[in-house]
């Protein structure tokens, strides 16, 4: 494995860590409605668990309400039950074959709890990025040990990996700040 391969690999893995972090952030509820909030809700569809998006159409009714329209009338009760049991603090209301999911306003205490969760998720993502840096540096040291590259090349590559790490950690910090601001906005 060459130095370029190691750098390319670590950058791709760091980018995947950022994407996973963004997905985790999307699941954290703010005061506003967005359909991504229900993405991980699983519905019992004739004996197998499937994502809600495979059995219903998700739309925004207004800024604080998600509309869920199951494609089969028989699924309305199951979809409503799945949303209620998803531990998101949501209380869906059914009218006909449309399920309305209003977003309750967040209390000040709940907002503070959520910002702590966001910061914790951010730290976890940073640790993942730093672990990738460590793995890349170990691979570079192995190349030096095997006499495939010089120590100067290893030092330069190590500096490049550090710059990638700094860039991705800064991106995580930016995402955390943005999510905190979104949560604290009343």
UniProtKB/Swiss-Prot annotation:
GO terms for molecular function: ribosomal large subunit binding. CDD domains: RRF. It holds the Pfam family RRF. One of its GO terms (cellular component) is cytosol. GO terms for biological process: cytoplasmic translational termination. Coiled coil: none annotated. Keywords: Cytoplasm, Protein biosynthesis. It is found in: Cytoplasm. NCBIfam families: frr. This is Ribosome-recycling factor. It comes from Burkholderia mallei (strain ATCC 23344). The gene is frr.
